[in-house]
């Protein structure tokens, strides 16, 4: 039975593209083995907070993941500093950290009374073994001590060293018209007393709801003032408003909510069937409370975290014929908001629908159906779900600084702006 269960899990995960031959040139949240699931990196103890801590503060970064086996694995981690674009920084370990940089993970527990066996591993940073000295971007690499060069997982976090203030706003007025499908972001960077920088020393990254496909990188200021920089580029700072995220809550097997049609048990797993997705083009904007793509792993019908189970979640998007000019993805925080094989839907000609099955740990999830045109890297919701300028979105702004002759990129400001502020 155990072999059968592992075989089913492996089939799902291999279908999702978990076998990756090499690390990406730019580090990102990525898993390279089907034995790891539910990887999370967040601030302190709040799963909904982005993993960005302030330097020399009491904050910690929490790293947690499941190893889909009850057998103990000798897993460890190492940490590397990265440039603003998540490429490896040209630094020695002693430049950015004190302590040991290959640390065995000693905090773990095994699952109990679950249909999927797993061992949860977790740790926090900084800790007694690792002290981080510089601001900027970092990547955590997980590996087995028996094969230290074979990376099993990479996850990213940042340390902020505030040196600026930032003010911004989101408007429904864009180059596409007033109150259309789009939102326009405008913001101003104000230098703190005692700090100044020229625009060439700064790198700015803007994300919408922590998505990567439509992020804006390395944008230049529109206006340069004595103590501030204004960013108002009408071309680059336009984003689809999109729609509010759909929600799933299967933290309880019998009292579920959101877009769940039913939960059933087919030996040996629970299956969550999601209501079919559909385009809502032409439909007016409808407000709904969401958490902008985030997830929270939890369960209401268990006694401890070790009893939180997994379910196979089935997404469908009916279409009479497949779209040959692109692909449909299910996006959300559960896969880091990336567009890759792990969340790409497959067209079923017999059922006339796109389908995707994901092995997800029980809890609450936000998701959307995103269309990626062939040959593009930027997805769109206009075709799959619709878009409205009124939609509540969060915009994350990262400001990096490297002075002329400097040897690393500091994160001198991180700000999050809501479109409804």
Where are these regions (language model features)?
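Low-complexity, Pro/Ser/Thr- and charge-rich linker/hinge segments at domain boundaries
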Residues: 159-182, 388-412
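Contiguous beta-strand segments within globular domains
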Residues: 33-81, 178-189, 300-315
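Ligand-binding face of N-terminal immunoglobulin V-set domains in extracellular IgSF glycoproteins
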Residues: 115-145
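Bacterial Sec-dependent N-terminal signal peptides
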Residues: 1-25
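Short, compositionally biased P/S/T/A/G/V-rich stretches that sit at domain boundaries
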Residues: 20-55, 161-176, 289-302
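Aromatic-rich carbohydrate-binding modules that target alpha-glucans
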Residues: 97-121, 212-221, 314-362, 374-403
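Basic K/R-rich, polyanion-interacting modules in nucleoproteins and related proteins
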Residues: 274-324, 411-421
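Short acidic/polar inter-strand loop motif in beta-rich domains
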Residues: 84-86, 130, 144-152, 211, ...
């Amino acid at each position: 039975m155990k072999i059968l269960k592992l075989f089913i899990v492996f089939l799902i995960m291999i279908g999702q593209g978990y076998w990756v031959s090499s690390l990406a040139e730019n580090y990102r949240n990525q898993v390279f083995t089907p034995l790891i699931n539910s990887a999370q990196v967040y601030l302190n103890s709040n799963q909904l907070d982005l993993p960005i801590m302030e330097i020399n503060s009491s904050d910690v970064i929490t790293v947690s993941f499941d190893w889909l086996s009850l057998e103990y694995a000798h897993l460890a981690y190492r940490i590397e500093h990265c440039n603003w674009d998540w490429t490896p920084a040209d630094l020695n370990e002693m430049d950015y950290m004190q302590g040991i940089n290959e640390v065995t993970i000693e905090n773990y527990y095994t699952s109990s009374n679950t249909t999927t066996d797993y061992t949860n591993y977790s740790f926090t940073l900084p800790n007694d073994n690792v002290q981080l000295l510089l601001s900027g971007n970092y990547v955590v690499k997980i590996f087995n001590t028996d094969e230290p060069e074979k990376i099993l997982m990479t996850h990213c976090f940042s340390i902020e060293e505030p040196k600026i203030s930032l003010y911004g706003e989101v408007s429904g007025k864009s180059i596409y018209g007033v109150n259309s499908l789009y939102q326009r972001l405008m913001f101003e960077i104000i230098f703190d007393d005692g700090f100044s920088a020229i625009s060439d020393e700064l790198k700015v990254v803007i994300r919408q709801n922590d998505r990567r496909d439509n992020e804006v990188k390395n944008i230049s200021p529109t206006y340069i003032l004595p103590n501030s920089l204004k960013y108002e580029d009408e071309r680059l700072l336009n984003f689809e408003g999109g729609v509010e995220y759909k929600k799933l809550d299967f933290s309880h097997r019998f009292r579920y909510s959101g877009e769940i049609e039913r939960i059933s048990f087919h030996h040996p797993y629970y299956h969550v069937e999601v209501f079919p997705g559909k385009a809502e083009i032409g439909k007016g904007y409808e407000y709904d409370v969401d958490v902008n793509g985030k997830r929270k792993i939890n369960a209401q019908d268990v006694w401890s975290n070790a009893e939180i189970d997994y379910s196979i979640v089935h997404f469908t998007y009916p279409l009479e014929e497949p779209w040959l000019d692109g692909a449909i993805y299910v996006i959300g925080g559960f896969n880091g908001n990336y567009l890759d094989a792990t969340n790409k839907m497959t067209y079923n000609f017999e059922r006339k629908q796109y389908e995707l099955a994901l092995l997800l740990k029980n809890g609450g999830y936000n998701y959307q159906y995103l269309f990626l045109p062939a040959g593009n890297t930027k997805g769109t919701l206009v075709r799959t779900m619709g878009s409205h300028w009124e939609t509540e979105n969060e915009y994350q702004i990262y400001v990096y600084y490297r002075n002329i002759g400097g040897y690393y990129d500091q994160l001198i400001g991180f700000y999050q702006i809501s479109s409804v502020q």
